[in-house]
């Protein structure tokens, strides 16, 4: 009975996210999405003179300097853009001191980005990862793929609770054969991933979306508190009223931001 109730609650949660994200994506965010990522799935076509209303970011300053007139780069659109939503489902994302956990925040972002991409006519894919890739849905068009992505973000259990952002980047390097737009959703509590993430960003358009909980930025001085790492299982009692302990916690928090 509890399992049935849990499934029903999960489906209601997916439905609420779908309704909210559809509204935001169609009424508020779709124009910003199209404007922000125009060019991510485009091929260069030719140069032409700047006209009022053209986007300034497409101005080619080298050609402008040579011609003494303002020129922009004109693009021709590829058949479609592949959008990959990458979500960290490691143990640390189950934490949340407010109404929603970081995992549930990730589901909200997945819904918003997924439906925005769908309304823009783009394909949407999903990669869930922890220590390694846990689930990969290849890019496809249609709302059903977005709804499934939301459901998987909320329900998929990691094979290992630890985090390896580098393993996710390496998987994408091998799996994506064409330039894609990648939304990378994580709390980025990991070490030594900067090089592989930077290499991925050289081949694709990567947008990092950081999941941050207020308690991870500032812990109140409330005396002795037992902390447990949800990924390693290590636990320790810390006196949060101790100034040295507060300094150490603040330093650790800044390390991951």
Question: Where do the protein language model's features map onto the residues?
Answer:
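Acidic, polar low-complexity linker/tail segments
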Residues: 12-85, 89-97
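DG-centered beta-turn motif at the end of beta-strands
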Residues: 61, 87-90, 126, 172, ...
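Short beta-strand-loop
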Residues: 123-152
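A short, flexible beta-alpha/helix-coil linker loop
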Residues: 90-94, 131-134, 243-245
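…and closely analogous acidic/polar surface helices at protein-protein or active-site interfaces
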Residues: 76, 93-123
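Von Willebrand factor type A / integrin I
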Residues: 1-36, 42, 46, 54-55, ...
């Amino acid at each position: 009975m509890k399992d049935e109730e849990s499934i029903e609650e999960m489906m209601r949660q997916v439905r609420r996210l779908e309704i909210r994200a559809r509204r935001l994506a169609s009424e508020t965010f779709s124009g910003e999405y199209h404007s922000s990522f125009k060019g991510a799935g485009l091929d260069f076509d030719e140069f032409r003179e700047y006209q009022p209303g053209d986007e300034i970011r497409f101005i080619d300053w080298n050609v402008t300097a040579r011609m003494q007139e303002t020129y922009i780069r004109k693009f021709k659109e590829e058949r479609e853009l592949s959008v990959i939503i990458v979500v960290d489902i490691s143990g640390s994302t189950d934490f949340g001191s407010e109404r929603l956990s970081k995992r549930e925040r990730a589901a909200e972002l997945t819904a918003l980005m997924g439906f925005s991409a769908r309304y823009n006519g783009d394909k949407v894919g999903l990669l869930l990862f922890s220590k390694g890739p846990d689930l990969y849905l290849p890019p496809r068009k249609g709302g059903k793929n977005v709804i499934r992505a939301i459901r998987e973000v909320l329900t998929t259990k990691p094979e290992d609770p630890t985090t390896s952002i580098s393993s996710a980047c390496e998987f994408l390097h091998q799996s994506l054969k064409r330039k894609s737009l990648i939304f990378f959703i994580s709390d980025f509590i990991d070490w030594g991933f900067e090089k592989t993430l930077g290499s991925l960003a050289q081949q694709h358009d990567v947008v990092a979306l950081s999941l941050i909980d207020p308690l991870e930025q500032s812990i109140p001085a409330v005396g002795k508190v037992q902390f447990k790492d949800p990924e390693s299982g290590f636990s320790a009692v810390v006196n949060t009223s101790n100034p040295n302990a507060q300094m150490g916690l603040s330093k650790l928090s800044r390390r991951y931001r």
